UniProtKB/Swiss-Prot annotation:
Pfam families, per the entry: EF-G_D2, GTP_EFTU, IF-2, IF2_N
Region (Disordered): 99-366
Low complexity bias (residue ranges): 145-155, 219-234, 270-283
Keyword Iron: no
Localization per Swiss-Prot or TrEMBL: Cytoplasm
Organism phylogeny: Bacteria, Pseudomonadati, Pseudomonadota, Betaproteobacteria, Neisseriales
This protein's name: Translation initiation factor IF-2
Region (G4), start-end ranges: 571-574
Residues covered by region (G5): 607-609
SUPFAM superfamilies registered for this protein in UniProt: Initiation factor IF2/eIF5b, domain 3 (SSF52156), P-loop containing nucleoside triphosphate hydrolases (SSF52540), Putative DNA-binding domain (SSF46955), Translation proteins (SSF50447)
Major localisation: cytoplasm
Length: 962
């Protein structure tokens, strides 16, 4: 940028030097003589002053000049109206000093781009100062403007002239104006590159048409008639802008004060928190450390900083100054690209200053903390649901997933980050990693059931007792019930043994009694446990001629576990070998003491075959029921337990339900485990259709969506939607738990089987009439497994044999067991075509024996030695290139050509091998019998002597059995 003197500029304009000095003085530029230097800023101030003074109607304005001048002044608009700075307003003398300082700082001349940046920085700094002066002056003249006074000459308001947008003022003569403009353009070649950026800084309200003076070309003004600077309408608009600026300043001052108070409060809270933390730490560790003095808040930066301008960094410094001044961006709630505020990036008040280039650390203000690592590990309380993935468990403990995987691998489980584990395993992992694990109550709809149970209250009335008959197999349980019911159930049972739970109710002169008949066979443990769970009183049947047997002891354990009183029926006392006293002694050893011996258990000697003392047994049962005072609500939704369940081909899922409370009616919505449905039919134990059943009455129900598990609790719900929701939730929950346990079992088997030879597997598919039967059969077959042959139950279910069962058997090479069920025609045809074996049974013994035989056939045969003869060596003949030949006498049995032999010397086995050749005289023979001589050679062995004995034997394979 080149400077000119006042005289040179006056010569270019063809104006007297005195007039030019006068106009400069009126414009706020203090020049005393013609030799004083004029800068570009001085010329701009003079230009703005003449524009205001003479009007804006010139038609010879250069486009380039218009862009340059408007852009520079537009920056003032942005800083004044949009940013609304909260600053200290300097006086007119201070403004002049600042302008002079800016001119002095810009004295060193650099290349064009550097000069452009420096000029722009100075112009914007001066414009900000002028904007403050303008705001103060306009506020002072607000009353005069409202009274309708005309604006004073621009010479009395130099700062006001600089704050308005206007084109270059025209001189009185167009010729002089043209020459001046041409000379100005020749003198300032470095201004042109700055035009695009300055144009980009043009405020939005100017582009929308608010700066109307900038868009119209100026017309020549008459020198004799002075023109008003602005119209009354424009003056009113400016007054309104001034009022808004004053209100904005007041608001910003309030915000600044509030921010300072907030910082002070935060500092106090920070100091207090630090002191408390240090005190707690010192109390814990026993170390006393001096308290850290509180940091003082930084003093507020001055509103306008007149720093020396470095032209190379003028743009960056200017942007930083604008962001640091006041709260221009913060007041609007946005700043920078994307509306993001750098100063309030985190909490709106913490100001961060980045220093220097890459690699410099972030400098924090006093109200910010650097992150401090925790001094001790944090212990979390982890709520663990029934199943949880490894990733979720790690998230709950706030640790990395790899730590959980590592802990599980130490426990012998190979898992992935997305794999589910069961609740027990997860609790162990939580404890292992130092946290507190608690089983979480599932957020399931089953809570509705408890709420509904509490809400329903009905009068409890006496109910019949539920009596379960238990005992060892063939001790006469069903025969006893037959006599009580006057029926012949035993004759209809396969093999004379009970394989289902039978539920009956019997009317006696003293009331109704419900009986549950449980199987006595060892395979039906689960059935006996379910019977004890649903019962009030247990009748323990013991045969007087047989004594206490394993299932008798098991029945005692079930009764004690359920907390149920017992009545002992000593059966078969009509037999000659009956010894009731021995039964009492044996049961006393198992803590079942007769009442006549000082105990609390009634012993009744009965005969189911002849009906002896049956009435006394029923009296004892009813006496126990009176002591228990059994009651249940009648007028309430029914609740009960599933005793047995099966799949009937014609009727669908059929379940035997023992009602425990309430009244079950036809059409009720029943929920039983994972099955639900509306009761379509109810049948009693005699096959008669009934419409309702009260407490302690067993019924057979139809209409469930699936076959429920035996032992499940069942209850009536009023809402089908709620029943469906709970059933589906249970299905998903049980599936997740089952999969998690299966995965754990697979991994355990994988580790256990590492390095072992692969055992043979016998695959079997079991279909039975009721759930209890296939449970018992599957459990018994699995017990037959050995290290060499294992029973693999691929599928077990209730109902007839279907095509899907046959197809599964084809794919897996299994055979099918039908227990009290049959295959339909299509299934039989498919099985015949594919050679799939289907075996039907109605006695559990037979099924177990056949499977055991099949497993025995899969066992590898056992090799045994069978001695065939004995040979005595009487002469040894050595033949070159052949070896030693033994001349022998067969003393016992027979010697065969392919026999194995043992060489025995002095009753010690020297060698075991085979014969290389066997001859009698010169002929090869297959065998030589006792009493004949022979010659023989041993294969690969020549160390034989006279007097040695040879023991001949064969190796035979013997089939093994389980």
């Amino acid at each position: 940028m080149s400077n000119t003197t006042v005289e040179q500029f006056a010569a270019e304009l063809k104006r007297p030097v005195e007039d030019l000095l006068k106009q400069l003085k009126e414009a706020g530029v203090s020049k005393t003589g013609g030799g004083d230097s004029l800068t570009l800023d001085d010329k701009q101030l003079l230009n703005a002053y003449l524009t205001k003074k003479n009007g804006s109607n010139s038609s010879t304005i250069s486009i380039r000049r218009t862009k340059t001048e408007v852009s520079t002044v537009d920056g003032v608009k942005v800083e004044t109206r949009k940013r609304g700075r909260t600053v200290n307003i300097p006086s007119a003398e201070e403004l002049a000093a600042q302008v002079k300082a800016a001119q002095t700082q810009a004295a060193p001349v650099r290349p064009e781009q550097t000069a452009e940046d420096a000029a722009k920085a100075r112009a914007e700094a001066a414009a900000r100062a002028e904007a403050r002066a303008k705001a103060e002056a306009e506020a002072a003249k607000l009353k005069a403007a409202k009274a309708g006074n005309k604006a004073k000459p621009a010479a009395q308001k130099p700062t006001e002239a600089k704050a308005e947008t206007a084109p270059v003022a025209a001189e009185t003569k167009p010729a002089e104006e043209s020459k001046a403009e041409k000379a100005q353009a020749d003198k300032m070649p470095s201004k042109k590159p700055a035009e695009p950026k300055e144009k980009a800084a043009k405020p939005k309200h100017e582009r929308n048409g608010k700066g109307k003076d900038a868009k119209k070309p100026a017309k020549p003004a008459a020198p004799a008639v002075p023109q008003p600077v602005v119209s009354a309408e424009e003056q009113a608009q400016r007054d309104e802008e001034a009022r808004r600026a004053a209100a904005l300043r007041a608001h910003q001052e309030a915000l600044l004060k509030e921010k300072q108070e907030r910082q002070a409060r935060r500092e106090a809270m920070k100091q207090q928190a630090e002191q408390q933390a240090k005190a707690a730490q010192e109390a814990k560790t026993g170390r006393q450390r001096p308290a850290k003095p509180a940091e003082k808040p930084q003093a507020a930066a001055p509103a306008v900083e007149n720093k020396p301008v470095n032209p190379a960094k003028a743009k960056k410094e200017d942007r930083r100054n604008r962001d640091d001044e006041g709260q221009g961006r913060n007041a609007k709630g946005k700043g920078g690209k994307g509306g993001r505020d750098r100063n309030n990036a985190r909490n709106g008040d913490d100001e961060r200053v980045r220093g220097g280039k890459k690699g410099k650390k972030l400098k924090l203000e006093p109200n910010q903390h650097a992150f401090q690592a925790p001094t001790e590990p944090v212990v979390h309380e982890v709520l663990v649901p029934e199943t949880i993935t490894v990733a979720d468990l790690a998230h709950k403990m706030a640790v990395k997933g790899v730590e959980v995987v590592k802990a599980l691998m130490k426990m012998g489980m190979m898992v992935t980050i997305n794999q589910s584990i069961d609740q027990d395993t997860a609790l162990i992992v939580v404890e292992e990693l130092g946290h507190i694990g608690k089983p979480a109550a599932a957020d399931d709809p089953e809570a509705f059931l408890d709420e509904g149970a509490e809400a329903v209250e009905a009068e409890a009335l006496p109910r019949p007792p539920v009596v379960t008959v238990m005992g060892h197999v063939d001790h006469g349980k069903t025969s006893l019930l037959d006599y009580i019911r006057r029926t012949k159930v035993v004759q209809g049972e396969a093999g004379g043994i009970t394989q289902h739970i039978g539920a009956y109710h019997v009317e006696t002169p003293r009331g109704v009694i419900t009986f549950l008949d449980t199987p006595g066979h060892e395979a039906f443990t689960a059935m006996r446990a379910r019977g004890a769970k649903a019962t009030d009183i247990v009748i323990l049947v013991v045969a007087a001629d047989d004594g206490v047997m394993p299932q008798t002891i098991e029945a005692i354990a079930h009764a004690k576990a359920a907390g149920v009183p017992m009545v002992v029926a000593v059966n078969k006392i009509d037999k000659e070998a009956a010894n009731p006293e021995r039964i009492r002694q044996e049961l006393t050893a198992h803590e079942v003491v007769p009442d006549e011996w000082g105990g609390d258990v009634q012993f009744i000697d009965v005969s189911a075959k002849k009906g002896l003392n049956i009435d006394a047994l029923l009296e004892a049962v009813l006496l126990e029921a009176e002591v228990l005072e059994l009651t249940a609500p009648v007028d309430a939704p029914a609740k009960g337990i599933i005793v047995e369940a099966r799949l009937d081909k014609g009727r669908g899922a059929v379940a035997t339900l023992l009602v425990q409370s309430g009244t079950l009616k036809k059409g009720d919505m029943l929920l039983a485990g994972t099955a639900f449905g509306k009761i379509r039919a109810m049948v009693d134990e005699n096959g008669k259709s009934i419409t309702e059943a009260g407490p302690s009455i067993p019924v057979e129900i139809l209409g469930l969506s699936d076959v429920p598990n035996a032992g499940e609790d069942a209850m009536v719900l009023a809402d089908e939607k709620k029943a469906r929701e709970i059933a589906l939730f249970r299905q998903g929950k049980y599936r997740d738990v089952r999969l998690a346990k299966q995965q754990a079992a697979k991994l355990e088997n994988m580790f256990n089987n590492m390095g072992e030879t692969q055992a043979q597997s016998l695959s079997v598919i079991i279909k039975a009439d009721v759930q209890g039967s296939y449970e018992a059969l599957a459990g018994s077959l699995k017990k037959l497994s050995t290290d060499e042959v294992k029973v693999n139950v691929l599928h077990s279910g209730v109902g007839g044999i279907t095509e899907s069962d046959v197809n599964l058997a084809i794919a897996s090479g299994a055979f099918i067991i039908g227990f009290n069920v049959r295959a339909d025609a299509s299934s039989r045809k498919l099985a015949e075509n594919e050679n799939v074996e289907i075996r039907y049974y109605n006695i559990i013994y037979d099924a177990i024996d056949d499977v055991k035989a099949a497993m025995s056939g899969m066992l590898s045969p056992e090799e045994k030695e069978q001695v065939t003869g004995t040979v005595e060596i009487r002469q040894v003949i050595s033949v070159s290139k052949v070896g030693n030949i033994a001349g022998c006498m067969v003393t016992d049995g027979v010697v065969k050509r392919d026999s194995h032999v043992r060489l025995i010397r002095n009753n010690v086995v020297i060698h075991t091998g085979e014969l290389a050749s066997l001859k009698r005289y010169k002929d090869d023979v297959k065998e030589v019998r006792m009493g004949f001589e022979c010659g023989l050679m041993l294969k690969g062995y020549n160390e034989i002597m006279e007097g040695d004995q040879l023991e001949c034997f064969d190796i035979v394979e013997v089939a093994r059995s389980l």
